[in-house]
């Protein structure tokens, strides 16, 4: 029988950094609320959560890297919202942020979770920030807890 490794959703004793983009703040505040709720419900103490605000999604990877490099956290949760406009700016920002977050995670061997919405419309962002399509901040926090615990077992 093969050995199976799985993470679990018990957050006691875990510490997380959260990076939040302020651009589209009416959405990112909801993502942050969802993430904080998930962390609390899974046993992460308030004093084990640190939040850094950045101007927008493009700035998220730099602060996430600084947090990951500090070795103070079991995971870093990145939250932001990039909404398509009439120019190619959306593609550039979305691509660079997603690549940056993935690279930090791989380079640091730390769960750096991508909770950045990349959507076509404001309505889609609202749906993913706590209405019809759930709250992606909540989902990102759950992924961070699960991955932090999984990496401790491998």
Curated annotation (Swiss-Prot):
UniProt-annotated binding residues for 5-amino-6-(D-ribitylamino)uracil: 23, 57-59, 81-83, 114
Residues involved in (2S)-2-hydroxy-3-oxobutyl phosphate binding: 86-87, 128
Statement: the UniProt record of this protein carries the keyword Transferase: yes
Catalytic activity: (2S)-2-hydroxy-3-oxobutyl phosphate + 5-amino-6-(D-ribitylamino)uracil = 6,7-dimethyl-8-(1-D-ribityl)lumazine + phosphate + 2 H2O + H(+)
EC number of this enzyme: 2.5.1.78
Pfam family, one: DMRL_synthase
Source organism: Desulforamulus reducens (strain ATCC BAA-1160 / DSM 100696 / MI-1)
Top enzyme class: transferase
Gene Ontology BP annotations: riboflavin biosynthetic process
Active site: 89 (proton donor)
Record-linked InterPro entries: LS, LS/RS, LS/RS_sf
Record family assignment: Belongs to the DMRL synthase family.
Metabolic or biological pathway, per its Swiss-Prot or TrEMBL entry: Cofactor biosynthesis; riboflavin biosynthesis; riboflavin from 2-hydroxy-3-oxobutyl phosphate and 5-amino-6-(D-ribitylamino)uracil: step 1/2
Record-linked CDD domains: Lumazine_synthase-I
Keyword Transferase: yes
Name assigned to this protein: 6,7-dimethyl-8-ribityllumazine synthase
Taxonomic superkingdom: Bacteria
Molecular-function GO terms, alphabetical: 6,7-dimethyl-8-ribityllumazine synthase activity
GO cellular component terms given for this protein: cytosol; riboflavin synthase complex
């Amino acid at each position: 029988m093969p050995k199976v490794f799985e993470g679990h959703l018990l957050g006691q004793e875990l510490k997380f950094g959260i990076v939040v983009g302020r651009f589209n703040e009416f959405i990112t505040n909801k993502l942050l609320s969802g993430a904080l709720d998930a962390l609390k419900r899974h046993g992460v103490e308030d004093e084990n959560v640190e939040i850094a605000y950045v101007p927008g999604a493009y700035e998220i990877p730099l602060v996430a890297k600084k947090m990951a490099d500090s070795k103070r956290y079991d995971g870093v949760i990145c939250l932001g919202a990039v909404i398509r406009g009439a120019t190619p700016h959306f593609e550039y920002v979305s691509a660079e942020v997603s690549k940056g977050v993935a690279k930090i995670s791989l380079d640091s061997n730390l769960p750096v979770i991508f909770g950045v919405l990349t959507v076509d419309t404001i309505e889609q962002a609202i749906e993913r920030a706590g209405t019809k399509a759930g709250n992606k901040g909540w989902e990102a926090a759950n992924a961070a807890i699960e991955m932090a615990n999984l990496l401790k077992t491998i």
